[in-house]
A protein has these predicted regions:
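Charged, amphipathic alpha-helical linker segments immediately N-terminal to NTP-binding catalytic cores
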Residues: 1-5
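Walker A (P-loop) phosphate-binding motif
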Residues: 7-48
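Solvent-exposed alpha-helices and their adjacent loops that cap or buttress functional pockets
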Residues: 17-21, 81-85, 112-114, 140-144, ...
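Short, basic, glycine/proline-bearing loop/turn elements
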Residues: 24-28, 87-100, 124, 176
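General beta-strand structural signal in soluble alpha/beta enzymes
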Residues: 28, 53-56, 91-94, 120-126, ...
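N-terminal phosphate/diphosphate-binding loop that engages ATP/GTP or pyrophosphate donors
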Residues: 42-97
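Loop/turn-to-beta-strand initiation segments
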Residues: 86-90, 116-120, 148
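Conserved catalytic-core segment of NTP-binding enzymes
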Residues: 100-104, 125-225, 234, 243-244
Length: 244
């Protein structure tokens, strides 16, 4: 049984970890909860009075078909005429009618907008709703303005077939276990891709509330690169179960 009353609050911890002097430009990669991260973390930051810009360097579901819980939506360069207030969130992208999705706006425009928003959160990767991701040469798309990278993965893949759990060019077979997560962390096209010693790096293993305690304890012993943080969490419950 999970003693959630004892668990540390996730969004509070991430605000302290990722936001420095009131500013952060966060790129989110991987699978298993990126969109939940966008919505939940931006909502938490709003509650603290931060102005937040949500965007993508790849593709995102249209804000007209998915509720990002924002106060404003801009799908054109007219956003340059808008100045956000404190505690306000705005969605920005370019709409692709053929795809029915929001695609990446010019990175130069987003860099300019960073001057007027406290926090920018960028969905920098796609995983087609699968919990794990192997990248290609094309992704993730990390813009130069990035100050922090959050690599998300879903723990509900544990014990499931690799072929059914991973989006991307994966040739391995078998079941997902701790050694496979270790492989994903160390693989050049894996979880750590895009991270550097110059960014604040966080690994979020989401779904800590849906796996057994023995799995959480086993995953807690994973080794992470750089001076990064790692947390076994439940985004839906705003809880941290283990710190790596």
């Amino acid at each position: 049984m999970i003693k959630s009353a004892m668990a540390e609050k996730l969004w509070s911890k991430l605000e302290k970890t990722l936001v420095n002097n009131g500013k952060a430009f966060i790129s989110v990669t991987g699978g298993g909860g990126k969109t939940t991260f966008l919505v939940s973390f931006s909502s938490y930051l709003k509650s603290l009075g931060y102005s937040v810009l949500i965007t993508t360097s790849t593709k995102l579901a249209s804000p007209f078909s998915f509720d990002y819980k924002v106060d404003g939506i801009f799908l054109s360069p007219s956003i340059i005429n808008y100045w956000p207030g404190k505690g306000e969130s705005v969605f920005y992208g370019s709409y692709n009618e053929a795809l029915g999705k929001t695609t990446a706006p010019p990175s130069s425009m987003v860099s300019l907008l960073y001057d007027r928003y406290d926090v920018v959160i960028v969905e920098a990767d796609g995983s087609r709703m699968l919990p794990l991701k192997i990248h290609t040469q094309r992704d993730p798309v990390i813009w130069k303005t990035t100050t922090a990278i959050v690599a998300v993965s879903g723990l509900w893949a544990y014990g499931k077939p690799i072929k059914q759990s991973v989006f991307g060019p994966e040739e391995k077979s078998g079941l997902v276990d701790k050694s496979y997560y270790e492989y994903l962390i160390g693989e050049p096209e894996g979880m750590a891709k895009g991270m550097s010693p110059h960014t604040d790096n966080v690994f979020l293993f989401n779904g800590g509330d849906v796996v057994e305690e023995r799995v959480r304890k086993e995953m807690k012993t994973l080794s992470l690169p750089y001076s990064s943080f790692g947390f076994i969490v439940s985004m839906n419950k705003d809880e941290i179960y283990e710190t790596l």
